[in-house]
Amino acid sequence: MSFKELITQDQRLVVLRVLSEAGYDANESIINDGLDLYGHDISRDLVRTHLSWLEEQGLLTIERLKDGYMVASITQRWLRCSTRSCGSGRRKTPPPENLNTV
């Protein structure tokens, strides 16, 4: 695994952690601020790219507002994955004790 892939995986994991900590949904601005708090100063475009990838994996849903703004929500699939009961390649998984559960 390259260093770039490692950083990408960590950024996606942080997105999911931010959503978990925010009550399972948040807008892209809050997610971007959360990434910054975890040491990832990335563009809003890259945040949207990560959100879209995570949506493709079935780990979150995105509500796209008419102005293009995104609001992401965690899916039940992510909640199952967070306890390591599924496999979605190319994604780091946090220990279950670090996540809130429903």
Swiss-Prot record:
Q: Which InterPro entries match?
A: RNase_R_HTH_12, WH_DNA-bd_sf
Q: What Pfam families does this protein's entry cite?
A: HTH_12
Record protein name field: Uncharacterized protein HI_1498.1
List the lineage, top down. Answer: Bacteria, Pseudomonadati, Pseudomonadota, Gammaproteobacteria, Pasteurellales
